[in-house]
């Protein structure tokens, strides 16, 4: 178990799926969680011995069935594979984490909803306001904003991110402001700096200035965007060629609805399991992209007459 313990220690906040032969196995508290979420048998390894530990697992070919269930339940999952042919191995087979899937960073079709965006959000807390960034890695849409607590709260409720990335020391502050109903990941303080964020953004997009993204006067939004990129690196998602840039969101872009309005009017989700949301009633779109766009329009009605008329003209044609 030394190899397992070493890899688990490097990913303590995940459920570690540890490849052993033809199975992915989980141990200890991970096994207890996996057994409950997946409905698989929980047993013990080393029954009756001092090293007894809980164990549960499933065949490796069932990964695409079981992994989405763990992620939908709000868990981060580290997939640890065998990195060499067991028949050629001298001693213990080399293993390593090949994929880290979190509620907000997922590319599996079994998890993604085609008609909804699947955002990862990062939040940068300061006494003078909050920065936020939102990335749907499946589509490449990358958004950033900064402003008051009320404004960021409206964004969070409108865009409904699946996971938040926070600064460790401000976790309780952000929970008190925005609630405790979304899975969270915490990163070290040194990542939440403007210089680090600019370096990450300049490097990814091959630019020398953030002015083209509208972030040159938005330090808190810039930090939040940089945090997103660092988190993607942490989760082994480095193939980001489909990201074309960052779009800055401004409070004047439209009428961003608060959480109570979105919930009480059942705009995106119905109040009851058998109910129907407004979005479902209006959705006659032909593509997943159109369905996602419609939902964003519903939670952010336009307020500028010229833009409203332009949208009406586009729909009419």
Predicted regions and their residues:
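Charged catalytic and DNA/RNA-contacting regions of genome-maintenance
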Residues: 1-317
């Amino acid at each position: 178990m030394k190899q397992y313990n070493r890899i688990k220690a490097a990913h303590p906040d995940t459920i570690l799926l540890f490849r052993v032969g033809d199975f992915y196995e989980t141990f200890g508290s991970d096994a207890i969680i996996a057994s409950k979420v997946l409905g698989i048998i929980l047993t013990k390894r080393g029954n009756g011995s001092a090293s007894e530990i809980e164990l549960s697992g499933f065949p490796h070919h069932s990964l695409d069935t079981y992994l989405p269930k763990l992620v939908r339940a709000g868990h981060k999952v580290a997939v640890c594979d065998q990195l060499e042919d067991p028949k050629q191995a001298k001693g213990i087979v080399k293993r390593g984490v090949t994929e880290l899937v979190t509620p907000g960073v997922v590319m599996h079709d079994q998890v993604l909803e085609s008609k909804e965006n699947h955002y990862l959000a990062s939040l940068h807390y300061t006494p003078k306001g909050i920065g936020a960034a939102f990335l749907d890695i499946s589509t490449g849409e990358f958004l950033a904003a900064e402003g008051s607590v009320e404004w960021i709260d409206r964004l969070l409720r409108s865009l409904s991110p699946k996971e938040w990335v926070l600064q460790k020391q401000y976790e309780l502050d952000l929970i008190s402001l925005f609630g405790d109903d979304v899975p969270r990941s915490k990163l070290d303080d040194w990542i939440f700096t403007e210089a680090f964020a600019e370096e990450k953004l300049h490097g990814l997009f091959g630019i020398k200035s953030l002015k083209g993204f509208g972030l040159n006067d938005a330090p808190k939004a810039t930090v939040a965007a940089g945090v997103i990129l660092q988190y993607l690196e942490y989760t082994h998602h480095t193939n980001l060629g489909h990201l074309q840039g960052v779009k800055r969101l401004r409070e004047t872009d439209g009428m961003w609805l608060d959480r109570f309005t979105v919930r009480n009017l059942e705009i995106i989700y119905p109040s009851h399991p058998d109910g129907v949301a407004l979005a479902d009633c209006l959705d006659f779109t032909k593509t997943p992209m159109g369905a996602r766009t419609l939902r964003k329009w519903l939670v952010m009605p336009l307020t500028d007459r010229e833009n409203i008329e332009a949208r009406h003209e586009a729909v009419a044609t």
